[in-house]
Amino acid sequence: MKKYDIKTTDKETLRKWFYLMTLGRAIDEKAPSYLLQSLGWSYHAPYAGHDGIQLAMGQVFDKDTDFLFPYYRDMLTVLSAGMTAEEIILNGISKATDLTSGGRHMSNHFSKMEWHIENVSSATATHDLHAAGVARAMVYYGQKGVAITSHGESAASEGYVYEAINGASNERLPVIFVFQDNGYGISVPKKDQTANRKVADNFSGFKNLRIIHCNGKDVFDSMNAMTEAKEYAIANRTPVIVQANCVRIGSHSNSDKHTLYRDENELTYVKSADPLYKFHRMLIRYGRFTEEELKEIADLAAKDLKAANRKAMAAPDPDPSTVKDYVLPEPYQPQKYKEGVQNEEGEKETLVTAINKTLKAEFRHNPDTFIWGQDVANKEKGGVFNITKGMQQEFGIERVFNAPIAEDYIVGTANGMCRFDPKIHVVIEGAEFADYFWPAVEQYVECTHEYWRSNGQFTPNITLRLASGGYIGGGLYHSQTIEGALTSLPGARIVYPSFADDAAGLLRTSMRSKGFTLYL
């Protein structure tokens, strides 16, 4: 049964929706003027044509129970979710009081992390992995909510989107993947992306996955789809894909000129399909509002935008001297052996035994510690080198478990899980050997700049463990040392113990420190 329609939806709800859609469109249309005046908003991706689904995503989002991962076109989504026009403009013109990053991140990347509107990368759809990770934490800690992640249909060509959906369906995670399908990836038409007309159909064979199609241009169809998706995901603890059919009325962004690849007939059609125009006409045709009433709402939106712009323009600019702030949080300060030297007393242990014992000790110390990766939890086998032997037996499958052979998923879901609560610390076996880690470098990069990009609001507490530089003479794929390729990226601590006592001490410090550590 459909919950929302033009005849029965109460008037105050319709009034709120029309106000949000009108205000959002006014901001969207004003954004390019800031760049023309050299005031900022150097990157702007207009959302016009996606109005229905973006309004719906924001309306079903609950900041107390849900997590929202918007992409760079989701201006109306975050406005509908509760962000103000002023907060959106502060991001667009990169002010010091920008909630997303204090002016560090690209414009048109909106977040409010205290509300769980997450700070995401510009590398489109990488946040699908983070949504799966935070949903895993929601399940473990018993929070009845959903993670909503959004992007265009072309981003579904990325391998990590497949990894996220595959993992979410396998783990039965309450994630809503929203594909805003406008038919283009910049200038690349959908037919050059996939053979299916509806991209979500590429995933139709997945178990534990619901797929809902809706008209993303229509407010009511989108509201019904998102409401159904959320209710289903929570009730069944399974992921849902919502494929929303949209149009892109303008160019991809302010650096694109769509008249170079779209003909006049297409441009005429997308303008005629304008969701705001159609919603306006529908409200009048069904007698829910008069023209005068809608004009009053539009005038109020214009007035509010003017006030928001005035406040945002008066906000301070970022201080250039702070550019090196928030590269890495301060590490945990050890209580014993502060000089890194201790007396050799007691029985000597191998490096493997020292790591295994330290992992177990830290898991007892902090019940909010987790480990997963390849081959970490199979009966008596605890990884290729038995590093995690006995851990699942002692700490349970909820805290110690295997991951698919999907290195990006291993790292990305660790990032996401840490977003649920800063007390969470995650150890991951990033790959069988360091030599096989390269597919995860995309998420490694994400982890290195989360702290800086969020202006210190979030850092993934991850210890990424890799077996590196093996002495077995394994050649190209079992004996590589990879630290040289990764040390050029700020935002990660890299440790490489050579003795058992170093291995134990550095692992303990890594697991108690805030931030991202590569442990080789």
Regions of interest found by a model, annotated:
Residues 79-84, 159-163, 187-192, 224, ...:
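Short acidic, glycine/serine/threonine-rich loops at helix termini
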Residues 46, 68-71, 100-102, 132, ...:
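General beta-strand structural signal in soluble alpha/beta enzymes
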Residues 116-306, 310, 314, 487-520:
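Glycine-rich ThDP/TPP pyrophosphate-binding loop and its adjacent helix/strand module
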